[in-house]
Amino acid sequence: RSARFSFWPFTFSRSLKKTVGRNTRQLYRDTVADLDTLWQQQQAAVPVMVVKKIAIEPPEVWTQYHYPQPLSDGSILVRKSGLADVNQLVRLWPDGREEPLRDFRPNGRFSTAANKVIWTQTRPDSRWGLQSFSDIARYDMDSGEFRYLTEKGKYFSAALSPDGSRIATVEFDASRQCRLVLLDAQSGDVLRRYRNPDNDFLQDPAWSPDGERIVLTRQKYSGKSLTVIGVDSAEKVDLFGPTDEDIRWPQFYRNYILYNSPLTGNDAIWAIDMTSLKRFLLVSRPLGAYYPLPIPDQDILYLSDYESMGLRVARTELEPDAWIPASTVESRPLDYFAPIVTQEAPPDWETFEENAFDDYAVTDYHPDRQDWQLHSWWIKPELPILSAGFTVNNLTNTIAWEASSDYRVNEKTRAYHLDLSYAGLDPIFDLSIRTGERAAQYFDVTEADKVWDRWHENSISLTSRVVRNRIWDTYSGFHSFEIGAGYTQLQGKTHDSIGDLRNGTMLPLSLRFRWMRYRQGAYRDLYPKDGQVVDLYGDMAIPGYENEGRHLALRGIQYFPGLGRHHNLGAEIAGEWHASAGYNYRFASALPFVKGYEYFDFERMLRVGLFYAFPIAYPDWALGPFLYAKRLRAEVFYNHAALRVDSQNLPLRAVGLDLNLDYHLLSIPQISFGSGIRIAYRHAEKDIHIQLLFFGFTL
């Protein structure tokens, strides 16, 4: 019942309250209190070992240090990430100093050997948005060289051999076949694919110090197994399993395999003797210990220890005689799900499993028999247009319907769209039906008077669109080119100051080009640290109909890092031209207007601008489930524009400050709203002008 009205705020919470007497917030608090009690009882029965943490400056926000891997110079290479940090390769020195090496975009872990670092990285298909690849990237710490070893691969969990010459990785191809693969670490060529006849799901391969064996986990329906494979012989030896333990990150140490397991109910580091198959508890920590990496010749274990503010790097001595035999350790998993299983269990599991599921006939897919999914609603603020709508797709995502409404802040008009896209070909084809208002505001330079003309437009258009995506290292790129033609009917025109504005029809042609490139950012960043955007718009009406017009606009933005953390400096240049002499139709302006001024129409505009954006505070304050105040931010700006209005030049200059509060409404995490105020000093008028802002739009 709740699912049918999922679009209505708090539907699930109200249903819970009606059914069990507790809403979502109350149920969450009850659950946390219950889990806290159970966790304390669990901790009392599990030993906690002392580890030595690498001293670092305490972070202000949640920050993670993953996958510690010691280097020959005494430093420790880690992956650092968090609310305030992008994924970085960082050297940690014993005294706590951090030396950032570079940003990177790993799918998970990384691996280092012979001063080389490798990881797998997701890269999109250039054209098909739902198709992606996972390629192996390599970074040379000596030369600083970065390159991809594979193209359009399907690899994950890559590990360098101790001598840095080979890579063991898992390949999961488009036919859902999972294999262990050896690659050449210089060329990326496949050296060997190991047979996996049962198609077990493989994870976390790791090399033995001599490079002759590989340990990994194998998962099938019956559970996980810990397996050692001979590199040359391909012989497989299961050390234990299958088990329902979520064993991860195995590593060789002498005659042992170290690994992660939640056997005690808490993630801890364990060992198994490869000869006797006896298991031992090495490291147990209050909130979990992860990513073991032993240094055999020093008998030292590096790991990540979880704290309330994230993972921290720690170390401990490896003393096998002090390890705790698994037989003496009490397994106390919380099994919080157990009451539900007991409550819902059928009286006879064997009979249930035999008859629980219907047999469905396998038939060929027919594109004409579509299963439509209403899956998303959205708000898209893209100056000067604010749009909101919802999307319906078919199962293959080749056809999409969108119904939306947009508000043009320059004209203060609203329109409604129904759009159909077909993406089964290259290019993409878009059919759009639009109905709504248009407006033009004419400015009389002599009398400084503004006159509005409003009319109604109904239009239909067909557009052909070529889209390309690209990821290279830490940069993402996107460009699109589209051309379109349409039919527009105009009604209700009354103003004729720039020609004979007639009701009637027109056949518009349009051209759009967008090019974007930007560097990955942290969650708290306001803008990219490095990024570029170029937009080109062109419109014309075919001669011979009641209305004719021409329009051209070009805009470029460059983002730079600022002086402080999460600060940005930006520069913008924009130009726009509307044909006037001999033309009686004005296309809508495609660009934001000069900050600090209310929009009016013009023949030409050239605008340059600078801005500096920075966060002020993070209130982290909530008004129940209705509003969550996330961030207060500011933006100092300067705009200088030269306009041509009624054949006269009009310079506009403004300097000012935007203050905005970023917040979430109704516990909706996907959309961050922004509201604020703009205070601008206008040079020509010698006054201070104040505007209210919503999503960056003036109200």
Kindly give the residue locations of the regions a language model identified.
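Beta/coil-rich, acidic/histidine-enriched accessory regions frequently appended to metallopeptidases
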Residues: 4-114, 123
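Outer-membrane beta-barrel initiation region
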Residues: 40-44, 48-49, 61, 261, ...
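A flexible loop/linker signature enriched in serine peptidases of the S9 family
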Residues: 61-62, 80-89, 102-107, 119-135, ...
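Residue-level detector of Asp-centered blade-edge/turn motifs that repeat once per structural unit
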Residues: 71-73, 112-114, 162-163, 209-210, ...
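Hydrophobic beta-strand positions that form the internal "hydrophobic ladder"
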Residues: 76-77, 117, 167, 214, ...
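Outer-membrane beta-barrel translocator/channel fold
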Residues: 290, 308, 430-480, 486-501, ...
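C-terminal outer-membrane beta-barrel translocator/porin domains of Gram-negative envelope proteins
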Residues: 433-435, 446-450, 463, 495-636, ...
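Outer-membrane beta-barrel "beta-signal"
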Residues: 511, 608-610, 657-659, 687-699
